[in-house]
Amino acid sequence: MAAALLLVACARPYVSPLAPPPHRDEITAGYDAAWAAIVRALAKENVALRAIARDSGVIASDDFVAPIGVYADCGRIGDDLLEGEALVSFTLFVEPNGTHTNVQINSRMRTHMYRRGGSGKFRPTPVFQCASTGRFEANLLDTVRELVRH
């Protein structure tokens, strides 16, 4: 019993990252051109789609694996950042706004295989929630803007 209490007392707390709000942006193109560019940009990134509904403006990706730190911030345990892989998915909401198109990107992320810091064995559990770094969203919308220009 004393050993268990000592182990718990020495355990470092998990510090989760602050979740950012959904990424919102405006594309300076009509809905049809923006929609086509978004679909092409997702295909260029090789993102598998679970659902795509042009009439309602919703695109949902399947979960895909990404290195922690690229698209996902998974926090830390004590002073050690979590490293490894995260499962990430995105849902895009696209709606016309006159001659422009509004896009909102929601993200969902969790650890897949991780370790504390740069050493140790990778493990799948416990699963920790992660927050978006904003990199996927920014890169995707940059690609969309480039595609609507051409």
Regions found by a protein language model. Name each.
Residues 11-150:
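Ser/Thr-rich, low-complexity intrinsically disordered terminal regions
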Residues 6-9:
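C-terminal motif of bacterial Sec signal peptides marking the signal peptidase cleavage site
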Residues 1-3:
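Sec-dependent signal peptide recognition
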